[in-house]
């Protein structure tokens, strides 16, 4: 089975989309799926892309030119490369990741030109909050090309029932496969270090207006718990880090909040393991890979009902609260009031949940079944159906 996977960026700063896409490709390859991964090369100044192992996936990064002044991306070599690969594709499909970008429109154009099945994974970019954010740009793009591109896809991939319902609300009527992201298994921990110093509440994600960090600052300002600190880890986006730092200064919490910037690899896993509670007070999340990663490391999680994590309640491994300062403050108060042993027990319940339901091998098997069905080689899999 031959699949061309397309995505605009494999840079870590692109968040969960780039990481999930490369990990899915790596997990599909051992199942007999021949993957050609196409993305853009933004140059070494933008960072090191997240690449799947070369022995599993053939990855091509095509040069692009970006004008910050005009906010325009030009990537003619990308279109030529995708066109050439699509022309030679036999019995395969295109699986595109994301929306709005030049690469997404090119994938739809090429799929139509060669009459190839197109699967689109929006990765939460069509959630209501995301659609409202910078809507002055998105509304014209939706009317001009994005709606039609999505309508011509033969199948949409949602990572949760909540995201699937959002896609239906936009009038998209083709089949939807509901397959969550998988979770990378963290490396084995070393010997536990003795606990000294303050306990830690960790936020690890893009520092972006949609992540609710200002609510976290406000909630912490109300509580001001003794013996606790907050670590904010992740890349700055749209200059939002300056706004968060300003809020921290205004609340006189400079000595409590630490900003680490982007973290990857072993440093990321160490931050998770050092945390006593993980906090993601998001306005919009189609899945929330960082929630699953924290649980995989045995850390209880606080997140909002804008993320599809009702399992935090049903499996007693965290708090699933309404968006806003007051619900967040209440959840933080409850988490801080627990003993280390009680939080550890919740974290262990979360770790079991992730290992049982979110392994990449299971996720890849479900996606392969979807590919087979789209290509007419198998019956409809259970993950494709009506939105619950």
Placement of each model-derived feature along the sequence:
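A conserved mid-protein helix/loop that constitutes part of the nucleotide-sugar donor-binding site
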Residues: 19, 23, 199, 203-222, ...
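Glycosyltransferase donor-sugar binding loop
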Residues: 41-45, 183, 204, 229-245, ...
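Membrane-proximal helix-turn-helix segments that form the acceptor-binding/catalytic region
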Residues: 113, 126, 138-155
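A short, active-site helix/loop in glycosyltransferases that binds the activated sugar's phosphate group
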Residues: 150-175, 183-185
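Short alpha-helical donor nucleotide-sugar binding micro-motif in glycosyltransferases
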Residues: 262-263, 270-275
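Aromatic "clamp/platform" in nucleotide-sugar-dependent glycosyltransferases that forms part
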Residues: 283
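Short hydrophobic beta-strand element within catalytic cores of glycosyltransferases
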Residues: 300-304
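Conserved acidic donor-binding segment of nucleotide-sugar-dependent glycosyltransferases
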Residues: 319-326, 333-340
């Amino acid at each position: 089975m031959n699949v061309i996977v397309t995505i605009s960026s494999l840079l870590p700063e692109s968040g969960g989309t780039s990481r999930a896409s490369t990990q899915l490709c790596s997990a599909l390859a051992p199942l007999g799926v021949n993957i050609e991964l196409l993305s853009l090369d933004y140059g070494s100044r933008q960072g090191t892309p997240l690449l799947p192992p070369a022995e599993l996936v053939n990855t091509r990064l095509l040069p692009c030119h970006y004008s910050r002044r005009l906010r325009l991306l030009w990537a003619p070599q990308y279109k030529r490369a995708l066109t050439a690969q699509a022309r030679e594709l036999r019995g395969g499909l295109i699986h595109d990741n994301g929306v709005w970008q030049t690469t997404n429109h090119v994938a739809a154009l090429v799929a139509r030109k060669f009459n190839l099945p197109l699967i689109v994974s929006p990765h939460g970019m069509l959630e209501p909050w995301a659609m409202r954010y910078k809507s002055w740009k998105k509304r014209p793009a939706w009317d001009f090309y994005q709606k039609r591109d999505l309508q011509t896809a033969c199948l949409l991939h949602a990572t949760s029932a909540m995201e699937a319902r959002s896609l239906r609300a936009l009038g998209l009527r083709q089949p939807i496969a509901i397959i969550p992201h998988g979770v990378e298994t963290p490396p084995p921990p070393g010997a536990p270090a003795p606990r000294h110093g303050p306990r830690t509440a960790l936020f690890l994600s893009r520092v972006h207006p949609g992540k609710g960090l200002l609510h976290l600052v406000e909630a912490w300002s109300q509580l001001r718990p003794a013996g606790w600190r907050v670590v904010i880890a992740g890349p700055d986006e749209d200059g939002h880090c300056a706004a968060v730092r300003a809020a921290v200064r205004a609340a006189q919490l400079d000595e409590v909040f630490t900003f680490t910037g982007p973290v990857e690899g072993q440093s990321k896993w160490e931050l998770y393991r050092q945390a006593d509670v993980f906090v993601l007070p998001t306005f919009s999340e189609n899945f929330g890979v960082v929630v699953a990663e924290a649980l995989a490391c045995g850390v209880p999680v606080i997140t909002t009902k804008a993320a599809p994590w009702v399992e935090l309640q049903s499996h007693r491994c965290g708090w699933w609260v309404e968006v806003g300062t007051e619900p967040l403050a209440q959840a933080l108060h409850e988490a801080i009031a627990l003993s280390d042993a009680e939080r550890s027990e919740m974290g262990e319940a979360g770790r079991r949940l992730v290992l049982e339901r979110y392994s990449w091998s299971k996720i890849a098997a479900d996606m392969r079944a979807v590919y087979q069905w789209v290509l007419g080689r198998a019956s409809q899999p259970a993950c494709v159906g009506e939105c619950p």
